[in-house]
Swiss-Prot record:
InterPro entries: ATPase_NBD, Carb_kinase_FGGY, Carb_kinase_FGGY_CS, FGGY_C, FGGY_N, Glycerol_kin. This is Glycerol kinase. GO terms for cellular component: cytosol. Keywords: ATP-binding, Glycerol metabolism, Kinase, Nucleotide-binding, Transferase.
Length: 501
């Protein structure tokens, strides 16, 4: 094709294990993809770090590959999406990181967040929508300020910058001209008041974090600065955390629209509109903001183990050689044969929040085969998704009529049909499964006027397949009741047998 007349949007997707760059055309078709892995660093048990320089190098290699077939002058916008919460502090003058990036999985700051949980839980949940946990950026920033020599002193002199990885990449791409983040990423720091849409001074003072190190918080779609890294100036005009970008990429623009991303674990986000809803069992987060001082909010539920259970079936039990074999194996049986699998390898996430739960296979008889267990593993993903969606409906009072899906397991037709059956609602799989990158490409294109409205984006978005529920209500109720019983037996198990959390 003659690409010279085409306009393209470049999405940078900075993940936990690799940096990707995906080039989209103006009809949101994928033109090319670049992907490079970068090393994980584990200096001590519970510590997980990345070298920001290695991330930058991997990201630039990915960009080079993605744009190799076009002229960079045809790129009208760049959007950035990222692993959320991961924290970098760097020297404002030299641009050099003062310490490795502390990754969202890192647990070293548990003593800090245990103290916050014991003394300030309600205040933090009310203001930020989050629960005190090492997962979020605030305690990671405090740890670096307290433990890396001279950093606190430099921070107090205004010589240190903080950012999640979107902020760091924008800083690098603009040669230090822009120190910004968007509402969605700011809402994952545990320093941002999601009601007032500003950094919270009370929490900053509590953790002794100087406000001067924080980036300016802007809408998710506007020009933040211009990239100087590709030979010509290109506007950087979209920014969103990965899960929020996926919600946008699923065109979930209306209240009650919901998406599930099936990865190693799963993330379920629901658009709840312009007012934050307080939730007992879920996180309240900012989905995006398309204009200043106005945000769209989401409820978020995270499931710790979904796709990782298939990896365990493959590597731990050696029951299959490759992950793709699980669907045909599970298809060999009509149903689960009464077998339930609760994948509580590291406890249970939303809505149970039980770190003492442990994995369980129950209902085994002499007639149970490998295929029944394979089916039970797939079904556990659907049951856990229903667990979260039921809480979302109950706590929001919003009726959910369909579920949009993406991620690796969404390609599995057997699982997606069962997901529709056990929920009793339609499940919709999009044509383009790279919803995270597509979401931030949409935001970037909106920011420069390549697309003019959410309606225009919705009209471009395409469905691959819809799964319509065909199970009777009686069977649905019986199967889900069995799942709830199995979960009850898995909960608290590590306490019973004295296992480690």
């Amino acid at each position: 094709m003659n690409t010279m007349s085409h306009k393209f949007v470049l999405a940078l997707d900075e993940g936990t294990t690799s940096a990707r760059a995906i080039l989209f055309d103006s009809d949101l078709n994928i033109v090319n993809i670049g992907q490079y892995e970068f090393p994980q660093h584990y200096p001590q048990p519970g510590y997980v770090e990345h070298d920001p320089e290695e991330i930058w190098e991997a990201q630039m290699l990915a960009v080079k590959k993605a744009i190799s077939k076009i002229d960079a002058k045809q790129i009208v916008a760049i959007g950035i999406t990222n692993q959320r919460e991961t924290t970098v502090l760097w020297d404002a003058k030299s641009g050099k990181p003062v310490y490795n990036a502390i990754v969202w999985q890192d647990r070293r700051t548990s003593p800090i967040t245990d103290w916050l949980k014991a003394n300030y839980f309600k205040m933090i949940k009310d203001k930020t929508g989050l629960v005190p946990d090492p997962y979020f950026s605030a305690s990671k920033i405090k740890w670096i300020l307290d433990n890396v020599p001279n950093v606190r002193e430099k921070a107090e002199r205004g010589e240190i910058k903080f950012g999640t990885l979107d902020t760091y990449l924008i800083w690098r791409l603009t040669n230090g001209k822009a120190h910004v983040t968007d509402y969605s990423n700011a809402s994952r720091t545990m320093l941002f008041n999601i009601n007032k849409l500003e950094c919270d001074r009370e929490i900053l003072e509590l953790l002794k974090i100087p406000e001067s190190i924080l980036p300016e918080v802007k809408p998710s779609s506007e020009i933040y600065g211009y990239s100087e890294a590709l030979g010509n100036l290109i506007p950087i005009s979209g920014d969103a955390g990965d899960q929020q970008a996926a919600l946008f990429g699923q065109v979930a623009f209306n209240v009650g629209e919901i998406k599930a991303t099936y990865g190693t674990g799963s993330f379920i986000l629901m658009n709840i509109g312009n007012n934050p809803i307080r939730s007992e069992n879920l996180l309240t987060t900012i989905a995006w903001g398309l204009e200043k001082n106005k945000a769209t909010y989401a409820l978020e539920g995270s499931i710790f183990i979904t796709g990782a259970a298939v990896q365990w079936f493959r590597d731990g039990l050696r029951a299959i050689d490759v992950s793709d074999e699980i669907e045909p194996l599970a298809s060999n049986v009509e149903d689960n044969g009464g077998v339930y699998f609760v994948p509580a390898f590291v406890g249970l996430g939303a809505p149970y929040w039980d770190p003492y739960a442990r994995g369980l296979i129950i209902g085994i008889t002499r007639g149970t085969t490998k295929a029944h267990i394979a089916r039970a593993i797939l079904e556990s993903m659907a049951y856990q998704t229903r667990d979260v969606i039921e809480v979302m409906q109950k706590e929001s009072g919003i009726s959910i009529n369909s579920l949009k899906v993406d991620g690796g397991a969404a390609k599995d037709n057997l699982l997606m049909q069962f997901q529709a059956d056990i929920l009793g609602i339609k499940v919709i799989r999009p044509k383009v499964m790279e919803t995270t990158s597509m979401g931030v490409a949409m935001l970037a294109g909106l920011g420069v006027g390549l697309w003019n409205s959410l309606e225009e984006l919705r009209s471009i978005w395409k469905v691959d397949k819809e799964f319509i529920p065909s199970m009777s209500e009686e069977k649905r109720r019986a199967l889900y009741s069995g799942w709830k019983e199995a979960v009850k037996r898995a909960m608290g198990w590590a306490k019973v047998v004295g296992g480690q959390v």
